[in-house]
Amino acid sequence: MTQMNLEELEVTFTDWVPENSIIKVIGVGGGGCNAVDYMYNHRIQGCTFIVCNTDSQSLKKSHVPVKIQLGSGLGAGCNPTEGRNAALNSQQEIEEKVLNTKTDMLFITAGMGGGTGTGAAPVIAAMAKNKGILTVGVVTIPFKNEGNESMSKAIDGIYELQKNVDSILIINNEKIYTHYGSLLVHEAFPKTDEVLATAVQGITEIINKPGYVNVDFKDVKAMMTGSGMALMGCGKGEGENRIKDAVTGALASPLLNDCDIK
């Protein structure tokens, strides 16, 4: 699996329109929208991006062209019930822009522990499941300093999301914080966006780019349908020890959480 150098792909927004792909990526809530904005800004190919949020002011700041305002636009106040209700009230627009007949695979990315991502992501997943769309959740859980209440909400949200996704990849913000060393917490958030982007990009590249073993969408769907919890590591290497370095990097990847697969 190859990893593009995301830092070299800064984009001028007026000169790129992403393709209308069978693969959709939707960011739900503040954290999810930030991650999808990062993917869009870095020209990740092979998928179509959508952002949705209950906060209309935050939504306007996104560079992603396709936007869905959930509910009245006044935010969810860190209340997952508000996020859920806002998504339920916006089902028609979600169906039209996200779950149309051109969509075969959907990534739902969200930061769990707040109101919109925690409450709305499971609603969107259930809608996708009802349409037979291969659905993958890529979500984060909070930093320790965000408190027990946020973590409790995140766990409840992941439990609800798991009911309706084929596969879920959970990224631990705390591990990203420790993995990259002496970062301030606010400096770790862009790294979270990068890790989320790497996860989505890795899977879309398997489908869209030729490799040593030919894999198409049907192969990925057969493998991921109903597969449950997912693990993914990403590493790269150069020079004489490139294979060893890539494997070592993949095993140390923040995407693996605390799982020991050595």
Task: Show where each model-derived region lies.
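Tubulin/FtsZ superfamily GTPase core signature
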Residues: 1-262
